[in-house]
């Protein structure tokens, strides 16, 4: 498959299948969903809600969540952005970071 916004968004439909692979009844402190671009398109809150609805976990994170929090924690204002994503994804990511108050 090609990397497209449509294919990345469709990952949401397979979360339940993937999450069913975790040991039933096991409690996790944190689960990380490792697809930055899908997290952007699906939405960080939606990713967290889906994971928490299928797995006993305290926290859910994504690379996007971590990057946003880290940039805020170090007081970043002006950031350079380099990413291996298709332009549609890169633009959306830049818009999100700008909405967070960063200058790109």
Describe the role of every protein-language-model region.
Residues 40-52, 94:
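Short Gly/Thr/Asp-enriched flexible loops that form oxyanion-binding sites at enzyme active sites
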Residues 35-45, 84-89:
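Gly/Ser/Thr-rich loops at beta-strand to alpha-helix junctions
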Residues 1, 26, 33, 67-69, ...:
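Ligand-binding pocket scaffold of soluble enzyme catalytic domains
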Residues 18-27:
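Phosphate/pyrophosphate-binding loops at sites that engage ATP/ADP/AMP, CoA/4′-phosphopantetheine
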């Amino acid at each position: 498959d090609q990397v497209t916004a449509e294919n990345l968004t469709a990952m949401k439909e397979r979360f339940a299948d993937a999450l069913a692979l975790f040991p039933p009844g096991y409690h996790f402190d944190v689960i990380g969903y490792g697809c930055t671009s899908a997290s952007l398109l699906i939405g960080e809150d939606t990713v967290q809600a889906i994971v928490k609805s299928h797995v006993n976990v305290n926290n859910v994170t994504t690379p996007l969540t971590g990057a946003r929090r880290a940039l805020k924690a170090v007081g970043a204002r002006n950031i350079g952005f380099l990413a291996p994503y298709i332009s549609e994804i890169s633009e959306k990511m830049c818009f999100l970071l700008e909405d967070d108050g960063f200058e790109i």
